[in-house]
Structures are given as structure tokens and as C-alpha cells.
């Protein structure tokens, strides 16, 4: 048996209560959003921005003020700088499209790839997780433009710089033995790299 309220004003009270609760909920969400925005906003900006490793166009291996360059492994950076100097003598300018990345920035790139390709397996062809990416440790760099990648594909071993993945002509890592033995065979893509299986 249903209980009804026939008291005067009972139906108005029932109509006002949800309205008041909705208003309070909206005020609470607004307050939380404001506080969160003040605290988390700058952190997110840092993760998304240069502090996290994001890079704009035209960055070179000599741009020490950029964390994506400054946080590269010192041996990798030395090799890149020597290669860039020699390439410049031939009219080729080597740009850094991506270098060191914070774990947060790398994870963001990974999640974007999962969303773009609609699967973790397909995304893994292009973007590693923060736990496995050599960018996070500063041991990998993505270079450009295409003239630079072509130049490094011909001369990279002289500097111990090797293209690691066949599907990523821009991705280079330091391979110390390359100077004597040449670059090792490339993996088809990152899914075939044992380091990515951790």
C-alpha cells in the first residue's frame, strides 16, 4: 500500500527538494572544479608542456633550455650534436621532434594512441607505455625533417646512432657497437622489441 501525503504544501515540498538538491550539487561541483583547477591545472600544464618533454617545431640538439633536450642521456646528446654539426656542413639541419619525456607525458601519448587506434595492440606499434619507453629514460630521440632522417640513415652508425624500428624512420637510439659493427637489424615495430615486453 502506497503512502501519500495529503498535507497542504506537500507536493510543493516534493518539487522544491529535488531542485534544491540539484542546485547544491551544481554549487559543489563548481567549488570542486575551482579548487581542483587551481591545484591540478598548473600540474597538468607542466605535464602537457615543455616541462614534461613536449616540444614545438624547430628545436635542435643545441637547445639546452628545453627539458626534452637537456634531459637526454649525455652520451646520446653528444653523439647527436656531433652528427648535427657534420650534417650542417652538408646543408642538413637535424631537428628534435621529441626527446626525453616525463612518465606522465609518455602515458598521455600512449592513452591518446589507444584512443586513436581503438586498441592497445595497435597503439603499441607507435607508442610505448611510460614503463617501457626509452624516451622516458632519455635514451631515444625522434628527429626530423625527412632530409635529416635520410642523412642519419646513411651516416648514423658513424656516430653510434641507429634507427631502431623499421616503421619509425625518425626514431634513433645510441648503439655503442655500431661504430665498428654497423647498426643492428631493425625491429619491424616496437611490438617486436623485447624491451617493450616488460
Description of each model-found segment:
Residues 19-38:
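Hydrophobic membrane-insertion alpha-helices, especially the h-region
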Residues 38-198:
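Cell-envelope/glycan interface and biosynthesis
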Residues 2, 6-25:
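N-terminal Sec-pathway targeting helices
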Residues 10-13, 34, 44:
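General helical secondary-structure elements
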